[in-house]
A protein has these predicted regions:
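Disulfide-bonded cysteine-rich modules in secreted/extracellular proteins
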Residues: 25-30
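Short, highly selective alpha-helical patches that border small-molecule cofactor pockets
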Residues: 1, 115-116, 166, 170-174
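Structural alpha-beta junctions
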Residues: 125-128, 175-185
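Phosphate-handling DNA/RNA-contact segment within nucleic-acid enzymes
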Residues: 54-154, 170
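Short, acidic/turn-prone active-site loops that include or flank metal/cofactor-
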Residues: 132-138, 162, 187-190
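Short, small/acidic-rich helices and loops at N termini and domain boundaries
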Residues: 1-20, 24, 35-57, 175-176, ...
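Acidic beta-strand-to-loop metal/phosphate-binding motif
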Residues: 107-109, 153-165, 186
């Protein structure tokens, strides 16, 4: 969900300042996402930074999105309430993590940034894992926009959330590929996504 940063009744007098395209993720630091049990090495690979409070607790994640190898947007997500906002735009970016991988035997698609990093760790940190940008409702659009990227892989594994929306989106996304290429991964009962599995270890 998006949060509304504006308030009050004088909306007609508000001045809208366009968000500048960031040159870099200019807040936070590379560290383990301790709230999600994701290692510093994985966070660093994906370019994810954290903001900490005075007690050293992770309070915000910063997820970078690239157009090719140029940073176009950063998603800021609060740990406590899970609200987020985006600096820049990811309308014409690749999927989360897409810039890190180029072809291979397997690529796994998941439904969120933390699930992407978690699946990467669960798979031994050696297989490509990317995340859609707009959740289950935007999965088909996101994957369609990156079909050229997926053509470079032999197998596409779809591992969306283990809920109704995720399962429905998995079927729709699988239909974008020839039947022998796309496979839907069903997570064990009790796990919504890869991060649940990582945290249970």
């Amino acid at each position: 969900s998006y949060t509304n940063a504006c308030g009050g009744k004088d909306m007609q007098t508000a001045t809208v300042t366009p968000t500048k395209k960031p040159d870099m993720v200019d807040e936070g630091q590379f560290s383990a996402l301790t709230d999600r049990k994701i290692s510093r090495a994985t966070a660093t690979k994906y370019g994810v930074k954290c903001v900490h409070d005075l007690q050293g607790n992770v309070v915000k994640h910063l997820y970078p999105y690239y157009n090719g190898h140029e940073l176009s947007a950063t998603k800021y997500r609060n740990v406590k309430d899970k609200d987020f906002f985006v600096s820049g735009t990811y309308n014409d970016t690749g999927l989360f993590g897409q810039q890190l991988f180029k072809g291979g035997k397997y690529v796994t698609i998941v439904e969120g940034e933390c699930d992407a990093m978690s699946a990467y760790e669960l798979l031994g940190s050696k297989w490509a894992v990317v995340s859609i940008k707009r959740g289950a409702q935007g999965a088909v659009r996101d994957v369609k926009e990156s079909l050229e990227f997926f053509e470079e892989f032999e197998n596409v594994i779809i591992a969306f959330d283990n809920d109704k929306a995720g399962k429905e989106a998995s079927i729709k996304v699988a239909r974008l590929f020839k039947p022998s290429k796309a496979k839907i991964l069903t997570l064990p009962h009790g796990y919504k996504g890869p991060n649940d599995m990582l945290r249970s270890n």
